[in-house]
């Protein structure tokens, strides 16, 4: 650009050109005027009561692209090797041209002498040697690149195979865990059903146990009741004996099936006497003792390990922190007390043939012909009721949760917003730079009324007592005026 003269510089200062502004470039626009700042300030004031919200989470920052469009990773060594190959190729091309030019010059300068021919042959040999060296280097580099590519591809294939195997193993482990949890849940559900079935049977037998306490003590008493009753009692005894024998056989078969003991190790008696029945039960209880203790200890330890109750409770001597086997052993240690509690006639049952129960019970109220386990029966009923209440509560809470979830998932759609059936409105911005008046003076209402009455040139009496006196005076004057009126003497001129 040519240098401006003094006259041109003066003319530019006298008549400056306006600044060229790109109206489409919103980022670099800067008017430099103070009004722009005021407008921005006013707009901020108009929207300062709006709720500040963050960026919407409906769209991600980066677009969702297919993984095949992602760029591949290249090592730095491979990048520099490619550049070196390009440079070597260019240098070799230039060198060959230069050599050809030199050969042409030498041929033009030479006169066909032998010395010139010898020099040309030597140069050709040197060129052939250089080309062979370059070819060998190129082959070595290409071999190295191929080996590196093969190593990279093999490493990638190995890594993919390892990842595939790891993913497969994790899926298999998750599947096995799900199957194991399902089997455990099914086993627990089955055990719960079996326990409830036994509990229902025990509740059903309670009436039979209570009725058995009213049976006669001796055969002579039964004979006195009559032949029909005697036959009924004999049939009942036979059925009970068969029932106890079946229970003993069932316990024996279940123990053999679960490998608790061998089938030949315990032989049950086939006699139906009372002593034989007790002997069979004692044998089974003795064989089951070790198995029951091991099973109770095993599952008690698992339950305590899964729950943090044992870790939180520092005292290990509490009953809750001990194993189930120890708790059962501690409860059965005082067997005399437990047996004595079952010989109390709490239901006031009267034995058939006896008029009173006092004759066959001792001073402490213990009756050897009574079996009453009402305490244990009440505990069973309490556990059953608590379990049923918990189940019903969990079901009701599940229904409530499902209802709440359904209510949340329901779309909030206004059915009246279509076809112009709803008033559409826009929230107006609040008034700017406005402050409502706030009373800061301490005048009372009487003082304010007196002030404004004085300004208007009137006098107002704010004393209520004076008003009452004036009213009394007015009433007295009205009464006096009424007394001065001429009384009615009964004379009427018109009709």
Curated annotation (Swiss-Prot):
<dbReference type="InterPro" id="IPR039223">
    <property type="entry name" value="AATF/Bfr2"/>
</dbReference>
<feature type="compositionally biased region" description="Acidic residues">
    <location>
        <begin position="81"/>
        <end position="151"/>
    </location>
</feature>
<comment type="similarity">
    <text>Belongs to the AATF family.</text>
</comment>
<feature type="compositionally biased region" description="Acidic residues">
    <location>
        <begin position="23"/>
        <end position="45"/>
    </location>
</feature>
<dbReference type="Pfam" id="PF13339">
    <property type="entry name" value="AATF-Che1"/>
</dbReference>
<dbReference type="InterPro" id="IPR012617">
    <property type="entry name" value="AATF_C"/>
</dbReference>
<dbReference type="GO" id="GO:0005730">
    <property type="term" value="C:nucleolus"/>
</dbReference>
<feature type="region of interest" description="Disordered">
    <location>
        <begin position="462"/>
        <end position="495"/>
    </location>
</feature>
<protein>
    <recommendedName>
        <fullName>Protein BFR2</fullName>
    </recommendedName>
</protein>
<feature type="region of interest" description="Disordered">
    <location>
        <begin position="10"/>
        <end position="155"/>
    </location>
</feature>
<keyword id="KW-0539">Nucleus</keyword>
<dbReference type="GO" id="GO:0000462">
    <property type="term" value="P:maturation of SSU-rRNA from tricistronic rRNA transcript (SSU-rRNA, 5.8S rRNA, LSU-rRNA)"/>
</dbReference>
<dbReference type="InterPro" id="IPR025160">
    <property type="entry name" value="AATF"/>
</dbReference>
<dbReference type="Pfam" id="PF08164">
    <property type="entry name" value="TRAUB"/>
</dbReference>
<feature type="compositionally biased region" description="Basic and acidic residues">
    <location>
        <begin position="46"/>
        <end position="62"/>
    </location>
</feature>
